[in-house]
């Protein structure tokens, strides 16, 4: 009669590969917004201290709120997170405009140039980098003010920055 193998017999065969599959560990995607980061960390937005990528200063609570309102994206470097403060955001917008300006289109002509409705065109403020809403884009069209093509993206001026010019 054959005896069943004991645990000692199977130990001679070496380590088992069962359960040791070599699959890459998938990490969850890193949040793109400060609100998303606060939710992931389960902390209030007020407790988020995020340094500016350019000057290193921590964003104020108002700048944290503006960052998400402008629909800007967090910068991740080796699992460290950075954002952009108001001053550096404005400086970056100015630099980008001066270095990468391509063309100017007045008012409703943007629809002819792009082949899209003004409501379907993504436009950021060339001063503060906020995404323009429909009313702001219509205001530019109605007043025959300029839209600028900068680095392949459309720029205009938001209602707040318009008052500082």
From Swiss-Prot:
<dbReference type="Pfam" id="PF00518">
    <property type="entry name" value="E6"/>
</dbReference>
<keyword id="KW-0238">DNA-binding</keyword>
<dbReference type="GO" id="GO:0006355">
    <property type="term" value="P:regulation of DNA-templated transcription"/>
</dbReference>
<keyword id="KW-0899">Viral immunoevasion</keyword>
<keyword id="KW-0945">Host-virus interaction</keyword>
<comment type="function">
    <text>Plays a major role in the induction and maintenance of cellular transformation. E6 associates with host UBE3A/E6-AP ubiquitin-protein ligase and modulates its activity. Protects host keratinocytes from apoptosis by mediating the degradation of host BAK1. May also inhibit host immune response.</text>
</comment>
<keyword id="KW-1090">Inhibition of host innate immune response by virus</keyword>
<keyword id="KW-0010">Activator</keyword>
<keyword id="KW-0244">Early protein</keyword>
<dbReference type="GO" id="GO:0039648">
    <property type="term" value="P:symbiont-mediated perturbation of host ubiquitin-like protein modification"/>
</dbReference>
<dbReference type="GO" id="GO:0030430">
    <property type="term" value="C:host cell cytoplasm"/>
</dbReference>
<feature type="zinc finger region">
    <location>
        <begin position="52"/>
        <end position="88"/>
    </location>
</feature>
<keyword id="KW-1035">Host cytoplasm</keyword>
<feature type="zinc finger region">
    <location>
        <begin position="125"/>
        <end position="161"/>
    </location>
</feature>
<dbReference type="GO" id="GO:0052150">
    <property type="term" value="P:symbiont-mediated perturbation of host apoptosis"/>
</dbReference>
<keyword id="KW-0862">Zinc</keyword>
<keyword id="KW-0479">Metal-binding</keyword>
<dbReference type="GO" id="GO:0042025">
    <property type="term" value="C:host cell nucleus"/>
</dbReference>
<protein>
    <recommendedName>
        <fullName>Protein E6</fullName>
    </recommendedName>
</protein>
<keyword id="KW-0805">Transcription regulation</keyword>
<keyword id="KW-1048">Host nucleus</keyword>
<keyword id="KW-1119">Modulation of host cell apoptosis by virus</keyword>
<dbReference type="GO" id="GO:0003677">
    <property type="term" value="F:DNA binding"/>
</dbReference>
<keyword id="KW-0863">Zinc-finger</keyword>
<keyword id="KW-0804">Transcription</keyword>
<dbReference type="GO" id="GO:0006351">
    <property type="term" value="P:DNA-templated transcription"/>
</dbReference>
<dbReference type="GO" id="GO:0039502">
    <property type="term" value="P:symbiont-mediated suppression of host type I interferon-mediated signaling pathway"/>
</dbReference>
<dbReference type="InterPro" id="IPR038575">
    <property type="entry name" value="E6_sf"/>
</dbReference>
<dbReference type="InterPro" id="IPR001334">
    <property type="entry name" value="E6"/>
</dbReference>
<comment type="subunit">
    <text>Forms homodimers. Interacts with ubiquitin-protein ligase UBE3A/E6-AP; this interaction stimulates UBE3A ubiquitin activity. Interacts with host BAK1.</text>
</comment>
<comment type="similarity">
    <text>Belongs to the papillomaviridae E6 protein family.</text>
</comment>
<dbReference type="GO" id="GO:0052170">
    <property type="term" value="P:symbiont-mediated suppression of host innate immune response"/>
</dbReference>
<dbReference type="GO" id="GO:0008270">
    <property type="term" value="F:zinc ion binding"/>
</dbReference>
């Amino acid at each position: 009669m054959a005896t069943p193998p004991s645990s000692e017999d199977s130990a001679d065969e070496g380590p088992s590969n069962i359960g040791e599959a070599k699959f890459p560990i998938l990490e969850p995607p890193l949040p793109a917004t400060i609100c998303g980061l606060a939710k992931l960390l389960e902390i209030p937005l007020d407790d988020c201290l995020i340094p500016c990528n350019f000057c290193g200063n921590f964003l104020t609570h108002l700048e944290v709120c503006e960052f998400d309102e402008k629909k800007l994206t967090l910068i991740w470097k080796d699992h460290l997170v950075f954002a952009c403060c108001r001053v550096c955001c404005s400086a970056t917008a100015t630099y980008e405009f001066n270095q990468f300006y391509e063309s100017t289109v007045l008012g409703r002509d943007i629809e002819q140039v792009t082949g899209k409705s003004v409501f379907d065109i993504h436009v950021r403020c060339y001063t503060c980098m906020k995404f323009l809403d429909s009313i702001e884009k219509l205001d530019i069209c109605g007043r025959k003010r300029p839209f600028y093509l900068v680095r392949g993206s459309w720029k205009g001026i938001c209602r707040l920055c318009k008052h500082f010019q």
